[in-house]
From Swiss-Prot:
Ubiquitously expressed. Expressed at higher level in placenta, small intestine, fetal thymus and lymph node. Highly expressed in endothelial cells. Interacts with the extracellular domain of FZD8 and LRP6. It however does not form a ternary complex with FZD8 and LRP6. Interacts with WNT1. Binds heparin. Interacts with LGR4, LGR5 and LGR6. The gene is RSPO3. It is found in: Secreted. Belongs to the R-spondin family. Gene3D superfamilies: Hormone Receptor, Insulin-like Growth Factor Receptor 1, Chain A, domain 2 (2.10.220.10), Thrombospondin type-1 (TSP1) repeat (2.20.100.10). This is R-spondin-3. GO terms for cellular component: extracellular region; extracellular space. Residues 1-21 form the signal peptide. Its main location: secreted. GO terms for molecular function: frizzled binding; heparin binding; signaling receptor binding. Disulfide bonds join 41-48, 45-54, 57-76, 80-95, 98-105, 102-111, 114-125, 129-142, 148-190, 159-166, 199-206.
């Protein structure tokens, strides 16, 4: 009877030892799969189990649940991972998941970075930016609309024509201004940055090499004093050259008649 009890006790002890070795090997496999799990309550874990990992953490560390396959295990971290925010309680410091549209957050109601397709505005993730704001597709934030800003006009340039400041009566002058702030996508466009207007060139003699083309042409066309009268025909000769031959004959006949009439009048006076 005593021998039978001893044998049963021996069998039970061996069976318990076998179960313990299986659990230990399973815990080692889980720790190899996830390096953040503290091994045997070492590192950040205050209390732990081989199956569930950390159950509580040492002071100032955050407790978080991480999924491995179909189960979750407890880990102790110095800071919460991306997509989680840390909350400190008297008995535990806990990592809590951010909202579904938030990539990183400061707390439950304040997001610091949104997921793709959303724009950040005052800690919230929005599909579209509010009125008066526009979306910045680089930072994925709602920003203020920026309008164009320009500087004051520079002084007018000297009055010139064809690059010359003399030799002409009329010319043009220009002035410019610079763009200080370029507009954003919805901002007001920039006004013109240059202006041109007509002006009067100052009366002054052109220095050598500054005379305009018209001045040089006038100088070449100007006739000499001696040949001015000979070269230019008078108005009477021009009129006579334009007359038709029949008109010339009529004028000559009229002159002859006048001469004959004068002769007759002279002869009559002598007879009396």
């Amino acid at each position: 009877m005593h021998l039978r009890l001893i044998s049963w006790l021996f069998i039970i002890l061996n069976f318990m030892e076998y179960i313990g070795s299986q659990n230990a090997s399973r815990g080692r496999r889980q720790r190899r799969m996830h390096p953040n799990v503290s091994q045997g309550c070492q590192g950040g874990c205050a209390t732990c189990s081989d199956y569930n990992g950390c159950l509580s953490c040492k002071p100032r560390l955050f407790f978080a649940l991480e999924r491995i396959g179909m189960k979750q295990i407890g880990v102790c971290l110095s800071s919460c991972p991306s997509g989680y925010y840390g909350t400190r309680y008297p008995d535990i410091n806990k990592c809590t998941k951010c909202k579904a549209d938030c990539d990183t957050c400061f707390n439950k109601n304040f997001c610091t970075k949104c997921k793709s397709g959303f724009y950040l505005h005052l800690g919230k993730c929005l599909d579209n930016c509010p009125e008066g704001l526009e979306a910045n597709n680089h930072t994925m934030e709602c920003v203020s609309i920026v309008h164009c800003e320009v500087s004051e006009w520079n002084p007018w340039s000297p009055c010139t024509k064809k690059g010359k400041t003399c030799g002409f009566k009329r010319g043009t002058e220009t002035r410019v201004r610079e763009i200080i702030q370029h507009p954003s996508a919805k901002g007001n466009l920039c006004p013109p940055t240059n202006e041109t207007r007509k002006c009067t060139v100052q009366r002054k003699k052109c220095q050598k090499g500054e005379r305009g083309k018209k001045g040089r042409e006038r100088k070449r066309k100007k006739p000499n004093k001696g040949e001015s009268k000979e070269a230019i025909p008078d108005s009477k000769s021009l009129e006579s050259s334009k007359e038709i031959p029949e008109q010339r004959e009529n004028k000559q006949q009229q002159k002859k008649r006048k001469v004959q009439d004068k002769q007759k009048s002279v002869s009559v006076s002598t007879v009396h």
